Design a protein with these regions (language model features):
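Intrinsically disordered, low-complexity segments enriched in small/flexible residues
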Residues: 1-44, 49-51, 198-288
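Conserved catalytic cores of soluble enzyme domains
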Residues: 88-216, 324-418
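Active-site mouth loops of central-metabolism enzymes
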Residues: 53-60, 121, 355
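A structural preference for long, well-packed, hydrophobic secondary-structure segments
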Residues: 111-114, 282-308, 341-348
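Glycine-rich anion/phosphate-binding loops
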Residues: 27-32, 57-69, 287-301
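A structural preference for short, pocket-lining loop segments at secondary-structure junctions
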Residues: 38-51, 65-92, 278-281, 295-326
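Hydrophobic, Leu/Ile/Phe/Ala-enriched alpha-helical segments that form helix-helix packing faces
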Residues: 70-74, 109, 204-211, 251, ...
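A generic structural signal for short coil/turn motifs at secondary-structure boundaries
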Residues: 55-59, 91-94, 286-290, 322-325
């Protein structure tokens, strides 16, 4: 087993290769997901492994519930968690049910991370969509040269942006953009190893030995680091400007009178003069990139720092994350998970966080806003999708099924219909 390829192994084999000999217990399978417990250097760990052969995403309803349960158990017992991720994210053919289940799973992941649960992501070959959000929420990530991590996979980037954005069949270009070596250069918490059982096991053992001395998550430091990355890639923030007058009528009805609204890098923001309420919006109808996500996270951090207990309402009308070379170059997944962590931190510190869906909502942007929210409200005209329709058609080779607004409630992607 020493020289076998880690990423090519079955989920159960990957789990067994990581833990101390004779320590494996509680091995179980939930859908396509494998879970077991064991020790690494005599320290108790729970290990989760996805199945890379699951078509259209390996994180369905069953798998999401199983991971949520393990995170809860691990937090209660103070046992570290290792996620062996090789997945395109939420299972597309389960539609909204998978999206709703992933929303709940990601909420557990955010709360576990903020509570200090040690989490390690071992990246197999493909880690896209929701799986990449799980990975970038973890304390640390380990890649090999065979690893690929991105918010949007190569096929989705090409489907939505054309081959001029990225040729999904150009292995060199894909590796240069989202391969393990490229990703480890982005973050000081990430490591690169050989794609063998021995090297991944060594990385897991080094992590578990050092985990007690690892610094606590500092969202402000993380925000500063991500901002420097944007600047290094030519994405400088713009100064705020007054919001346009022709805001959607439904938004004008909701917002309190006299509020001063501004926009900055695609983010609408303003504060009520009559009550402790902050309002933000991603409502321009365009896919959201790293700079916009970072800007919103910064405004929300300011609420937490300067205005304790202030309620936060976010309005959403956008078709999801930006499937662009430029945004994946800076590792969009890390920006999306950072925003989600900031919002979850606000909720945990007494801020009421509400998401209101005005129009389109899809993919990782929806999850990053909905998972930490106390409530998600859907206004007339809301359209929730697991991915933009063109991306679903590219992956599944068929159109997504039509849905009724009542399906949103049943699936758990919305809490209240207005």
């Amino acid at each position: 087993m020493e020289e076998e390829v880690f990423s090519a192994s079955a989920p159960a084999e990957r789990i067994a290769s990581l833990v101390d000999n004779g320590s494996l217990t509680g091995a179980a399978q939930h859908g396509t997901l494998h879970i077991a417990s064991g020790t690494i250097e005599a320290r108790q760990v729970n290990v989760i492994a996805t199945n890379r052969h699951a078509a259209g995403g390996s994180l369905g309803v069953i798998e999401a519930k199983a991971i949520s349960a393990i995170l809860e158990q691990s937090s209660a017992a103070h046992h570290a968690v290792i996620l062996c991720l090789d997945s395109a994210g939420a299972r597309l053919d389960e539609g909204l049910a998978a999206l709703g289940a992933f929303r709940q799973l990601y909420r557990h992941m955010l709360d576990s991370r903020l509570a200090g649960l040690p989490t390690l992501a071992l990246i197999g070959r493909h880690c896209f969509g929701g799986a990449s959000m799980l990975a970038t929420t973890c304390s640390q990530r380990v890649y090999s040269d065979a690893s690929r991590l991105a918010m949007s996979g190569p096929a989705v980037i090409q489907a939505l942006g054309g081959s001029g954005e990225l040729d999904a069949n150009d292995a060199f270009a894909v590796t240069l953009l989202m391969g393990g070596a490229a990703r480890t250069r982005m973050s000081p918490a990430d490591h690169l190893c050989d794609d063998t059982h021995a090297d991944f096991r060594r990385a897991a053992r080094n992590w578990i030995v050092d985990v007690a001395a690892a610094p606590a998550l500092d969202l402000r430091q993380q925000h500063t680091r991500l901002g420097k990355r944007l600047l290094a890639h030519g994405m400088a923030p713009s100064p705020p400007t007054n919001a346009r007058d022709d805001l959607p009528a439904v938004l004008q009805e909701i917002l309190p009178p006299g509020i001063e609204l501004h926009t900055m890098d695609g983010v609408l923001f303003g504060r009520s003069k009559s009550s402790p309420n902050a309002f933000f919006g991603l409502i321009e109808g365009n896919p959201v990139g790293a700079l916009t996500v970072w800007t919103l996270a910064g405004e929300c951090l300011a609420v937490g720092d300067q205005r304790p207990g202030e309620a936060v309402t976010i309005f959403l009308d956008c078709p999801g994350q930006a499937p662009t070379f430029r945004d994946e170059l800076v590792m969009l997944s890390e920006y999306v998970s950072h925003l989600a962590l900031v919002l979850a931190s606000l909720r945990r510190n007494g801020h009421r966080v509400t998401l209101q869906l005005l129009g389109d909502a899809a993919g990782g942007i929806y999850v990053a806003l909905a998972a930490p929210a106390a409530r998600v409200l859907a206004l007339p005209g809301a359209n929730v999708q697991i991915l933009p329709p063109a991306a679903i058609a590219r992956v599944l080779r068929r159109r997504s099924a039509s849905t009724d607004v009542e399906d949103y409630m049943r699936a758990g992607v919305v809490d209240t219909l207005i």
